């Protein structure tokens, strides 16, 4: 069945809560192993039902934020989902206290019960109303940014549509596009400040109710981080400052020379090449057809996966009016299919969706029937390793998408990935400050972000733009609003993906087998153990970053300079 044909009927929330509660009562009283496992399966099936319906609503709301029906349904889910979170917490408590715990761990591994313990630390009935308020504020941010209507040269653009123009070869066009974009954010700064301030205060309130001084450790536990914490993140950021920031500055200097602008302003940065950034050849239909060819050639598994995505209509790719910004992959657990959402806008980012989000989706497809499904509840640094690594495994096929621009794509892909890491670290360090200082004013937050930004991104010249000079850039980063402390995961995953890129150049079969193994391990092992199991070095370890950088710079140096202008 195709996605558009999936029938949505509002669930009987009260009935499902009652049904699961009754099953949980039975689980806690299980007399033997068989009864315990049988009831556990029934409980899982009930949770999957509500997850499936929620994801259908969420996807359809993302596709059209102006659809009042799905907007209303999503608000209903936001109100009721904390009740199901409480039931999931109860399931975890029962597992931890059950006399069949060792049987469960023997059959399904210990990681689920380790996460149950994290959940014990982060849940209390007293925070339910606060979680509802948090969800409503997150939805308010999505609605505000998703509904942005920005005038540019007589036309109305959304955020994604305007970002595409910021890569234009004409400098005045880039400047005007950025001024329009930042003008919208500046005009909405007070609303964005209020939403974020309310979120920080609610999250701090939640942390205090749970017995924590700040929200930071709560966020780490909620992210399922079993074997690394904020002290690991701090040491990791120090490695970025020492090794990656200097390399990124050299890449920016090379860019300035290449595009002939000695003192680049912020609106020059998206233009990597004077001849124009690499653009994919073709519209959505052609790009998807090329992606199918690519995945069939890459492996039997990837070919089967992508064909199913097309046949079942599990992608909504091109930007349009009312569509939420960004891109993501999510899963429909009963349909047993992943779904890819994005905003194609005619840039190389369109191809990145067909590799990055497809990497997420491929892993979801490989593990679509995993039981218990909690063994597929990925930590984000592992999830993003799946997606970012797929970007590199598909490198040999980029000529299909870019033709003569493929050499530029290869360069820009690696260079942009290196340049991204300091930005990701800046967002993480900013959040450390925000949640350590929840009473800071919006003005103080912006000043702190600008201070951090100068440390990790010293090349930035905002050309006197008041909104940016005062530290407003972070408000465009939705993760700060929606998923506290998530963003550093992208950088950790990037280091893992770089390792796969280097390994793939040396031995494709070894690299691909390791990647498939990592996908199938899913969430059955904590991060450091999973990486060790598949032969990757931990990004937190001293020397991991330093070791791979020479191979990346060597690769960049090997590309044809005549084609990179």
Would you name each region that the model predicts?
Residues 1-277, 564:
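A well-structured
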Residues 113, 117, 318, 354, ...:
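C-terminal, non-catalytic "cap/extension" segments appended to globular domains
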Residues 122-123, 180-188, 228-234, 269-280, ...:
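Glycine- and acidic
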Residues 127, 131, 185, 189-193, ...:
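Hydrophobic alpha-helical scaffolding
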Residues 157-174, 280-355, 359-364, 466:
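Active-site-adjacent "gating/activation" loops or surface patches in catalytic cores
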Residues 242-243, 367, 378-407, 413-415, ...:
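Post-HExxH zinc-binding segment in Zn-dependent metallohydrolases
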Residues 261-290, 363, 414-420, 425:
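Long, K/E/R/D-enriched contiguous segments that form extended
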Residues 359-373, 393:
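Catalytic Zn2+-binding segment of zinc metalloproteases
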């Amino acid at each position: 069945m195709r996605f558009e044909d999936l029938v949505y009927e509002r669930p009987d929330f009260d009935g499902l809560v009652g049904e699961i509660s009754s099953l949980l009562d039975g689980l806690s009283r299980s007399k033997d192993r068989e009864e315990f496992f049988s009831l556990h399966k029934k409980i899982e099936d009930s949770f999957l039902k509500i997850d499936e319906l929620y994801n259908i609503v969420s996807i359809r709301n993302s596709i059209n934020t102006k659809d009042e029906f799905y907007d209303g349904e999503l608000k209903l889910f936001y109100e009721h989902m904390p009740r199901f979170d409480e039931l999931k917490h109860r399931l975890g408590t029962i597992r931890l206290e059950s006399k069949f715990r060792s049987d469960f761990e023997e059959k399904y591994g210990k990681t689920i019960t380790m996460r149950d313990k994290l959940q014990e630390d982060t849940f209390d009935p007293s925070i339910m109303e606060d979680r509802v308020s948090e969800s409503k504020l997150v939805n308010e941010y999505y609605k505000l940014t998703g509904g942005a209507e920005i005038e540019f040269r007589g036309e109305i653009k959304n955020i994604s549509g305007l970002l595409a123009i910021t890569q234009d070869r004409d400098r005045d066009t880039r400047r005007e596009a950025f001024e329009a974009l930042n003008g919208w954010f500046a005009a909405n700064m007070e609303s964005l400040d209020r939403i974020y301030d309310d979120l920080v205060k609610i999250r701090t309130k939640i942390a205090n109710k749970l017995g924590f001084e700040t929200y930071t450790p709560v966020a780490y536990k909620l992210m399922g981080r079993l074997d690394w914490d904020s002290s690991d993140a701090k040491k990791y950021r120090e490695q970025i400052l020492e090794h990656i920031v200097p390399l990124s500055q050299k890449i920016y200097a090379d860019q300035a020379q290449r595009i002939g602008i000695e003192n680049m302003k912020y609106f020059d940065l998206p233009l990597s090449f004077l001849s124009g950034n690499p653009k994919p050849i073709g519209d959505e239909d052609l790009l998807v057809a090329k992606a199918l060819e690519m995945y069939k050639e890459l492996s039997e598994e990837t070919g089967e996966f992508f064909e199913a995505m097309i046949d079942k209509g599990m992608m909504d790719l091109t930007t349009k009016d009312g569509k939420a910004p960004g891109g993501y992959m999510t899963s429909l657990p009963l349909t047993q299919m992943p779904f890819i959402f994005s905003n194609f806008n005619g840039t190389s980012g369109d191809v990145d969706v067909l590799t990055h989000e497809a990497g997420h989706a491929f892993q979801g497809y490989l593990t679509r029937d995993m039981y218990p499904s909690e063994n597929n509840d990925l930590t984000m640094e592992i999830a993003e390793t799946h997606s970012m690594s797929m970007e590199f495994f598909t490198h040999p096929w980029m000529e299909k998408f870019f033709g003569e621009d493929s050499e530029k794509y290869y360069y820009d892909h690696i260079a942009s990935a290196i340049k991204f890491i300091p930005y990701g670290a800046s967002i993480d360090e900013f959040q450390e400050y925000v949640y350590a200082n929840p009473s800071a004013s919006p003005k103080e937050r912006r000043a702190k972000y600008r201070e951090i930004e100068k440390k990790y991104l010293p090349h930035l010249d905002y050309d006197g733009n008041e909104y940016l000079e005062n530290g407003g850039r972070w408000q465009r980063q939705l993760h700060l609003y929606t998923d506290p402390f998530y963003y550093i995961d992208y950088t950790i995953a990037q280091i893992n993906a770089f390792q796969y890129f280097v390994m793939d150049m040396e031995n494709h079969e070894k690299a691909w087998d390791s990647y498939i193994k990592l996908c199938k391990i899913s969430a059955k092992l904590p991060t450091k153990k999973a990486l060790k199991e598949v032969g990757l070095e931990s990004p937190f370890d001293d020397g991991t970053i330093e070791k791979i950088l020479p191979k990346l710079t060597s690769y960049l140096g090997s590309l044809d300079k005549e084609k990179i202008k």
